[in-house]
């Protein structure tokens, strides 16, 4: 982007960063929505370690919901039973989530970076290594954005988990039902593993991204896609390492009174917190159970990060230009 700034965290005002983040979140979510729905369906499907076919037999006998076998078969099944719109289930809360999450994340990332640069000034030889600065700022941004927008994340999961028979007919009804049956804490089911997953994930993501971005920008890739490539590589590395906690979060999010009403009717009960849930999954499904849906998650995370970072940088560049053309102080482009 800027000819002077080599790092994402050094560019744009807070308002420009917020607007660019919201724009990136809006576009990214719509593009990757089908893969997100598929990922959630696969993550919520459990298998018995002692009898891998038990889940399928139960589904056939008691109507436990469809058995998904991979990304493409899952897409075909959803299209056949729920239609094209089934791949965009939960898109309204998800769009709200992605827009608000990205806006908060990039704004916090910029603010934490400025704080660290002021607390550890370069001219006094106290400056943190760039990778450490990026990790701290990214981890903080991910934690804050997740905590602020978590109810929307929970709603996104529950709507995506619905089959033909809807548990919640509308977003407003979902909010009312959850409050009436689960209380305020119902909106924050799974927040613990959510934070435990997102903090190292976003720390690693921004650390790798900020390291690769200036190097890839020198390659003059077509369509200025260096930011997209950096986003893909950073996302794959970060997602693989933290995926089990993402799966645990999803399983906990659909607990409560509506647990048996989703497309998977026999979702197990997990009521002992994050550590106990991990132990239960490993005991019942083996270590592989913690990585159920990893392939589609990487297929989703890679393009999502590519679209997000590419769109963010293009949008930020546009907003900086608009700011420079209008009244007030000018910023480098």
From Swiss-Prot:
Its main location: mitochondrion. The keyword Oxidoreductase does not apply. InterPro entries: Mit_carrier (IPR002067), Mitochondrial_sb/sol_carrier (IPR018108), Mt_carrier_dom_sf (IPR023395). The keyword Mitochondrion applies. It comes from Neurospora crassa (strain ATCC 24698 / 74-OR23-1A / CBS 708.71 / DSM 1257 / FGSC 987). It holds the Pfam family Mito_carr. SUPFAM superfamilies: Mitochondrial carrier. One of its GO terms (molecular function) is thiamine transmembrane transporter activity. It is a multi-pass membrane protein. This is Mitochondrial thiamine pyrophosphate carrier 1. Mitochondrial transporter that mediates uptake of thiamine pyrophosphate (ThPP) into mitochondria. PROSITE patterns: SOLCAR. Keywords: Membrane, Mitochondrion, Mitochondrion inner membrane, Repeat, Transmembrane, Transmembrane helix, Transport. Belongs to the mitochondrial carrier (TC 2.A.29) family. GO terms for cellular component: mitochondrial inner membrane. The chain crosses the membrane at residues 17-35, 96-112, 135-155, 190-209, 221-238, 293-310. One of its GO terms (biological process) is thiamine pyrophosphate transmembrane transport.
